[in-house]
């Protein structure tokens, strides 16, 4: 064999070896030969992918939050003065909510809470307070804020308006009252605030009233007497007749149960979570969740750290809230869960949900946990809109056969005497204007 032939044969042998090595490398690099772990990692969607999915859903489905306390923030910080730059709503406010962050959070609709606190110290139910006056002021400032920023916000009083506003690129804005004390325990005042645009009333806040027992009463070790009878029942009936959403956040467990027995329309929990996940009395027990499903209502999950993780509020994070969402969906069904953050109503929020800009991140986590697009659409807005539409439909039917309810609290004093004697000088004689016979019961 010549030197050249030997050299060529050596080259061919080396080339064949090189090709064999390259073939092995190609086989090892192919998907079929990849390890299960590496294949799963390559196929698994990234967090960014879930966030993009969440953004797409919120582009076509309005995210409607059940409870935001921005009006109370305005009351406390500016005494309800919103003009001349006192509330730069288009910029970043110190609290949790402003236009910039609402837009970033893809908010499509918001129930603004026109909250005023329970009397402190507590007073007898029939004692006069400033609660009704303060409530009217909160309605006023909220409507003025909506009007001032009408390029971005639209005041709405029904579910159809909410959808129209969303299609126009505006944030639909609704009003909710947080406690029966705010209407003076009066069905007449209930009707008046409905006329002003209020569309839900929380039956109690953190105080009992003439309608029902609050969870705070039970937390103080007092009996859970539930819905007051008969006046509380008449209150619920009149709310149903009006088309006012009955909100059961803040009420005691027996008030929840009693109300669900007598309600003629779906109820809501505007900002409550699951008691089985975190056993705080502000949350909803499983037996009540099952009744909410039968009632066709909705529980809108709140974010308050001490409610969603009663054992260790500091450890609460975005996944804790997802736990509550999935528990309610498991017990009541995906048709009966929503979102009610309680922004600007607390200073204690879970990590990852620090302000209203974080909703897409929450929805991304819900998708990552395994929820379908349709389930998420129900969660963010379709459920509360369905409930509201049904409440309106039932109200129209009831109004055809029922007159406004004239019930009143049995303990009410209808002839409240003046606190001081006002004397009038009549023909030179001092004559008592209010006598024991009249008891001050006239209005000349």
Swiss-Prot record:
Ligand binding (Zn(2+) 1): 67, 69, 178
Reactions that this protein is recorded to catalyse: an L-aminoacyl-L-amino acid + H2O = 2 an L-alpha-amino acid
EC numbers for this chain: 3.4.13.19
Leading EC class: hydrolase
Residue positions binding Zn(2+) 2: 178, 250, 271
Family membership: Belongs to the metallo-dependent hydrolases superfamily. Peptidase M19 family.
Name this protein carries in UniProt: Putative dipeptidase CPC735_015490
């Amino acid at each position: 064999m010549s030197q050249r032939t030997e050299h060529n044969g050596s080259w061919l042998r080396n080339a064949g070896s090189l090709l064999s090595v390259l073939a092995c490398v190609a086989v090892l690099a192919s998907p079929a030969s990849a390890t299960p772990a590496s294949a799963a990692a390559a196929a698994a969607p990234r967090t960014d992918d879930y966030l993009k999915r969440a953004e797409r859903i919120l582009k076509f489905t309005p995210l409607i939050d059940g409870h935001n306390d921005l009006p109370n923030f305005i009351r406390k910080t500016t005494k309800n003065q919103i003009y001349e730059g006192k509330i730069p709503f288009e910029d970043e406010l110190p609290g949790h909510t402003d236009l910039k962050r609402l837009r970033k959070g893809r908010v499509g609709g918001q129930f603004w809470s026109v909250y005023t606190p329970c009397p402190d110290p507590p007073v007898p139910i029939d004692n006069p307070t400033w609660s009704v006056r303060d409530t009217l002021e909160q309605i006023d400032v909220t409507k003025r804020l909506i009007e001032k920023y009408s390029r971005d916000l639209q005041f709405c009083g029904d579910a159809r308006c909410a959808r129209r506003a969303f299609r126009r690129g505006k944030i639909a804005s609704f009003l909710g009252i947080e406690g029966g004390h705010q209407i003076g325990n009066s069905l007449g005042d209930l009707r008046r605030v409905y006329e002003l645009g209020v569309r839900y009333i929380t039956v109690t806040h953190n105080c009992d009233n003439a309608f029902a027992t609050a969870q705070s009463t039970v937390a103080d070790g007092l009996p859970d007497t539930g819905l007051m009878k008969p006046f509380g029942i008449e209150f619920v009936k009149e709310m149903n007749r009006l088309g006012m959403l009955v909100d059961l956040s803040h009420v005691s467990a027996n008030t929840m149960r009693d109300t669900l027995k007598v309600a003629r329309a779906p109820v809501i929990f505007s900002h409550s979570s699951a008691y089985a996940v975190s056993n705080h009395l502000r949350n909803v027990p499983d037996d009540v969740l099952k009744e909410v499903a039968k009632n066709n209502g909705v529980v809108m999950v709140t974010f308050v750290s001490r409610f969603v993780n009663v054992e260790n509020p500091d450890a609460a994070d975005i996944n804790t809230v997802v736990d509550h969402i999935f528990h309610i969906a498991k017990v009541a069904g995906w048709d009966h869960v929503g979102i009610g953050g309680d922004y600007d109503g607390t200073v204690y929020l879970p990590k990852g949900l620090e302000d209203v800009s974080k909703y897409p991140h929450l929805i991304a986590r819900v998708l990552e946990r395994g929820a379908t697009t349709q389930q998420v659409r129900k969660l963010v807005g379709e459920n509360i809109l369905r409930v509201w539409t049904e409440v309106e439909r039932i109200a129209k039917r009831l109004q055809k056969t029922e007159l406004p309810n004239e019930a009143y609290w049995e303990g009410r004093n209808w002839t409240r005497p003046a606190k001081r004697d006002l004397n009038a000088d009549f023909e030179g004689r001092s004559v008592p204007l209010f006598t024991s016979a009249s008891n001050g019961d006239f209005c000349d």
